[in-house]
Amino acid sequence: MRRAYLNTMKLVLPAISKNERMARTQVCAMVATLNPTVTELGDIRCALSEAVTNAIVHGYGSPTDVDGKLLYIAVTLYEDRSLKISVRDHGRGIPDIAAAREPLFTTDDTGDRSGMGFSVMEAFCDRVEVMSRVGEGTKVTLYKTLT
């Protein structure tokens, strides 16, 4: 049985660091129409921030080089107060998704990244799905049901 949705939105943004804020603002404004608690909205904001940052930094490798690199974000709100947020890039892809989802796993040798992105997303969402193909990109989908 298919769930009835209340609203849906798609965003396409250049994959640059300042658009992480834009994504959070737009998505949270839409989610706010479901009247979530402050904690629930904070959870969504934090998980989305991690997903977008991962796409920019790891998917494309540069938080400042725009050159045709785009983020695709889709949000669906359902009548049962659940939501789905997908963040997709056409970047490098993840060679080993299971390893990438382990706490503290990082491919960053500069020490700038903690390897906690997926752990944070999983802590704040009911479910996180990751689909990726090396050389083609990654799609991270966040699921949450509000109280």
Where are these regions (language model features)?
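Conserved beta-strand-loop-beta-strand hairpin that lines the nucleotide-binding pocket
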Residues: 1-10, 55-147
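STAS-typified acidic loop motif
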Residues: 10-22
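A generic structural signal for short
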Residues: 15-16, 40, 106
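Conserved short strand/loop->alpha-helix "switch" segment adjacent to the catalytic nucleotide/phosphoryl-transfer site
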Residues: 24-50
